[in-house]
Amino acid sequence: MEGVIDFDNLERPILLQFYADWCAPCKMLSGVLDHIEGDIRENVDFVRVNIDHDRELKDEFFVRSVPTMILLNKRGDIYWRQTGVVPPQEIMKHVHQVE
């Protein structure tokens, strides 16, 4: 992940996608997210986190399996957390509801 994110001082909600290059379900989820990324970015910031390169962030959010998505509200609190592949409608529902 590039740059540093101050999770206690977010300007917008943020969706974190934790993945690994060797993970087949991660590739499936990435395809889903690629399809809806434009819609996601209208409402929240979107960051992909490779767990093999950013172990500190993986540990900070207690990510134990991938793919995992974590949606944080503007206060930096976890609003929604999902492990595994989910349909785009489920992702967008939460992206539209978070503040």
What kind of region is each of these model predictions?
Residues E60-R64:
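A short glycine-leucine-enriched loop at secondary-structure breakpoints
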Residues L15-L16, F46, M69:
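Hydrophobic beta-strand anchors of alpha/beta hydrolase catalytic cores
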Residues M1-P13:
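A short beta-strand-turn-helix
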Residues C23-C26, M69:
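The canonical Cys-X-X-Cys-His
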Residues I51-K58:
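Structural microenvironment flanking redox-active thiols in thiol-disulfide oxidoreductases
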Residues E11-I14, F18-W22, S65:
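Short pre-active-site segment immediately N-terminal to redox-active cysteine/selenocysteine motifs
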Residues S65, I70-E99:
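Non-catalytic, surface beta->alpha helical segment in thiol-disulfide oxidoreductase systems
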